[in-house]
């Protein structure tokens, strides 16, 4: 049975364009919309003159013809289930990815995902995990790394469990965007006594205010997001770290969207959270915690959150999927040089210049806090972010716009962590934007 039908009406092309790319491109965009909105069956009234084309696509006539002799039409349907080669080809059309996740995967990483699964207790898997941990420790510049099976949220939750286990109960959480606000909610769930230093969406933290707060002696730790993706600000972690350490406090960092996109040494922080997805350009599913302090055993905490337990067992406390570890290990090889970081910066700079030429207002930050990971465009009220995002999607251009915190502010975002995005694709995107909104 079919749960979400759609009818295509009046798909019409002027005669002189019917044997050109216009038909193919119009068909592609129509099916982009249908596929992206999860319709499962399509109905049309097809002209009898084009019956051969409809049959080739896969449409099936289900009723006698309707209309007049001069304009006779066939009621037809197309099932969007597996096995239709035309639909499969349309679905494989080139996608331009400006999302902050999921990310593009290299062919080498994709190949690892097709390997046969093998035991997480095997010598092969233990050696693979040790090698992966060593690579992560080098990239983050931390004393030790621990890998857990879960999303980046698990990495942050495990850090919070460590803070509580060390009786570091009183904390200051810094928030200037959606993910800072999320840290506030998470830390409170762990029973930590939290105060918030919150500034406006995308505003910089006043470091003098931070310093004064920490001098009060009311806190055991500080938690901050390094790259606040929701706005595209790179918080000044150098200065924040200096202030925190001047006050002999513990520093925990959510670096989920920074790691792999921005080269940075986390040697002076206590904990740093990231994941296998995002800018490491592997598949999401492995949570990563880098640490420069001793991990303590947690007797009264769910075992799944116990970093000490996982670290002691070489990050194999429970079942770990071998293909996820294989994929991550391979993806990390791209960081033997700085080329990946340079490409992120290069694409960011190129797109930013193009957006400026379209007179689109880009959210501004202090020079030191500009993030090359993502560009945030604050659209004027006359242009709907929802319309722009959905219209780009029909053209197989995927940007960040659906999150409620973006919609509330009429914001769209372009991320540059995807390895396959080219300058030609950026030019194409800018051209589509120009057609949509004008100069």
Which ranges hold each PLM region?
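Conserved active-site segment immediately N-terminal to the catalytic lysine
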Residues: 266-277
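Conserved beta-loop-alpha segment that forms the PLP phosphate-binding cup at the N-terminus of a helix
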Residues: 142-172, 180-184
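Acyl-donor binding region in acyl/amide transferases
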Residues: 1-72
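Active-site C-terminal subdomain of aminotransferase-like
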Residues: 104-105, 277-353
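Conserved C-terminal alpha-helix-loop-beta "cap" of PLP-dependent enzymes
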Residues: 356, 360-424, 428
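Active-site phosphate-binding strand-loop segment of PLP-dependent enzymes
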Residues: 205-256, 260
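PLP-dependent aminotransferase-like
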Residues: 165-218
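A glycine-/small-polar-enriched, mobile loop at the entrance of the PLP active site in fold-type I
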Residues: 94-135, 139-149, 153
């Amino acid at each position: 049975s079919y749960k979400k039908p759609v009818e295509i009406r009046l798909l019409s092309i002027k005669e002189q364009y019917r044997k050109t790319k216009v038909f193919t491109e119009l068909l592609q965009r129509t099916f982009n919309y249908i596929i992206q909105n999860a319709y499962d069956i399509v109905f049309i009234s097809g002209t009898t003159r084009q019956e051969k084309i409809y049959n080739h696509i896969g449409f099936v006539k289900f009723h006698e013809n309707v209309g007049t002799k001069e304009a006779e039409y066939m009621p037809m349907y197309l099932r969007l289930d597996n096995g239709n080669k035309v639909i499969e080809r349309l679905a494989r059309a080139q996608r331009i990815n400006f999302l902050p996740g999921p990310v593009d995967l290299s062919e080498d990483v994709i190949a690892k995902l097709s390997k046969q699964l093998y035991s997480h207790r095997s010598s092969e898997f233990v050696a693979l995990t040790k090698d992966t941990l060593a690579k992560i420790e080098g990239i983050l510049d931390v004393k030790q790394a621990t890998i857990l099976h879960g999303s980046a949220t698990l990495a942050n939750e495990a850090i919070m469990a460590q803070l509580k286990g060390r009786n570091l109960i009183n904390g200051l959480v810094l928030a200037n965007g959606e993910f800072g606000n999320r840290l506030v909610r998470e830390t409170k769930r762990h029973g930590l006594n939290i105060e918030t230093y919150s500034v406006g969406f995308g505003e910089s933290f006043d470091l003098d205010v931070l310093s004064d707060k920490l001098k009060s002696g009311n806190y055991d730790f500080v938690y901050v997001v390094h790259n606040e993706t929701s706005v595209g600000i790179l918080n000044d972690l150098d200065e924040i770290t200096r202030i925190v350490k001047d006050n002999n406090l513990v520093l925990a960092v959510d670096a989920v969207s920074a790691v792999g996109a921005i080269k940075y040494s986390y040697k002076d922080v206590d904990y740093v959270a990231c994941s296998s997805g995002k800018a490491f350009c592997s598949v999401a599913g492995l949570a990563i915690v880098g640490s420069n302090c001793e991990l303590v055993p947690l007797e009264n905490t769910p075992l799944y959150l116990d970093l000490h337990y996982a670290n002691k067992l070489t990050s194999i406390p429970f079942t770990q999927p071998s293909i996820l570890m294989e994929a991550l290990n391979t993806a990390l090889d791209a960081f033997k040089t700085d080329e990946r970081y340079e490409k992120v910066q290069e694409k960011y700079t190129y797109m930013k210049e193009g957006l400026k030429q379209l007179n689109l207002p880009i959210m501004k930050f202090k020079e030191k806090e500009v993030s090359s990971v993502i560009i945030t465009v604050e659209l004027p009220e006359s242009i709907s972010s929802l319309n722009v995002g959905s219209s780009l999607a029909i053209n197989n251009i995927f940007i960040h716009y659906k999150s409620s915190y973006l919609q509330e502010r009429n914001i769209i975002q372009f991320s540059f962590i995807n390895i396959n995005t080219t300058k030609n694709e950026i030019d194409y995107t800018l051209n589509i934007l120009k057609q949509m909104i004008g100069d």
